[in-house]
């Protein structure tokens, strides 16, 4: 009987030791897990969806290396950058105009990558050929986010387009598309979009590109934009089109470790090049960063990743 008690106590001791070791290991893992706040737009925005997708990709085995990305919705880019300045955010997605205009005032924030292209859709009710001449449109329907686009166009137009524009909020795009009667409908968006495809099925609506002169005016006056080729057959029967594009920008606070920035870049483009990337990752390309290498304050790790001079 004493031998059995000794054997039982020895087994119990070994079991307790194993439990204590496992608990200690879990505690060490927990202590090593660092949470990074990724600031994006409100729900139902593309930047919010991208942040959610990136956080899920980051949580996959072998990606995060002991860290978590936590998406946080913040109303606009200016507020996101302010929170990063106050160390209440580690990463953020802001739009191209915000990056161009606001980053010089936030030297502690650096660019990791430009993201997917948001093209400027021009849906015309004017007759083909499918190019919107500089002076053709008399009435426009556009989101408030396209104010600078319409203002630059207005300066070249014989009519006051600013006064003849019916404005809507970007999140109201689907409702604004329904039965619009203006000459031209403008909207920023990724591609392909189901609502654009549905509209183009109706006769009398054409996906168009702007006249070269107007495109040049836009790229000169809106330096955060670039001309972008929408591939042929993105929408049925559509030829390749030269559209205006704006790229959202992923930025990071300088206190974030270089190793995380490096893993982030590899995760972004690794998923983009996978066999089944998520929607907003499909049009990511490292090459897009070449368009902005002299214009935006890139993180040193990103500059090496893109092989900037």
Where are these regions (language model features)?
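Bacterial N-terminal signal peptides
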Residues: 11-23
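Bacterial N-terminal signal peptides that target proteins for export
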Residues: 2-12
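Bilobed "Venus flytrap"/periplasmic-binding protein-like clamshell domains
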Residues: 32-61, 118-179, 292, 296-301, ...
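An extracytoplasmic/periplasmic, membrane-proximal ligand-sensing/linker region
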Residues: 172, 184-185, 189-200, 207, ...
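Pocket-lining segment of extracytoplasmic ligand-binding domains
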Residues: 96-99, 155-249, 255
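Boundary at the C-terminal end of the N-terminal hydrophobic targeting segment
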Residues: 25-27
């Amino acid at each position: 009987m004493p031998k059995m008690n000794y054997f039982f106590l020895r087994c119990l001791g070994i079991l307790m030791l194993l439990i204590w070791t496992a608990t200690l290991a879990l505690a060490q893992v927990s202590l090593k897990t660092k949470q990074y706040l990724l600031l994006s737009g409100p729900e139902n925005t593309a930047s919010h969806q991208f942040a959610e997708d990136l956080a899920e990709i980051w949580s996959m085995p072998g990606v995060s290396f002991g860290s978590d990305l936590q998406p946080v919705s913040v109303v606009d880019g200016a507020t996101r950058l302010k929170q990063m300045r106050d160390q209440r955010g580690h990463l953020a997605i802001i739009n191209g105009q915000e990056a161009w205009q606001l980053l010089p005032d936030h030297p502690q924030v650096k660019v990791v990558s430009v993201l997917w292209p948001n093209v400027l859709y021009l849906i015309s009710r004017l007759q083909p050929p499918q190019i919107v001449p500089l002076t053709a449109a008399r009435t426009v329907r556009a989101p408030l986010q396209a104010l600078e686009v319409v203002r630059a166009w207005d300066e070249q137009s014989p009519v006051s387009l600013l006064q003849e524009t019916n404005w809507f909020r970007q999140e109201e795009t689907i409702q604004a598309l329904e039965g619009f009667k203006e000459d031209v409908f403008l909207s920023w968006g990724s591609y392909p979009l189901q609502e654009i495809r549905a509209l183009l099925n109706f006769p009398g609506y054409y996906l168009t590109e702007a006249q070269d002169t107007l495109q040049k005016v836009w790229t000169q006056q809106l330096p955060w934009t670039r001309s972008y080729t929408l591939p042929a057959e993105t929408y049925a029967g559509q030829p390749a089109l030269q559209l205006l594009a704006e790229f959202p920008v992923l930025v990071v606070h300088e206190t974030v470790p270089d190793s995380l920035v490096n893993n982030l870049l590899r995760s972004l483009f690794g998923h983009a090049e996978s066999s089944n990337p998520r929607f907003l990752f499909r049009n990511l390309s490292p090459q897009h960063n070449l368009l902005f290498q002299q214009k935006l304050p890139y993180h040193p790790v990103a500059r090496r990743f893109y092989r900037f001079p």
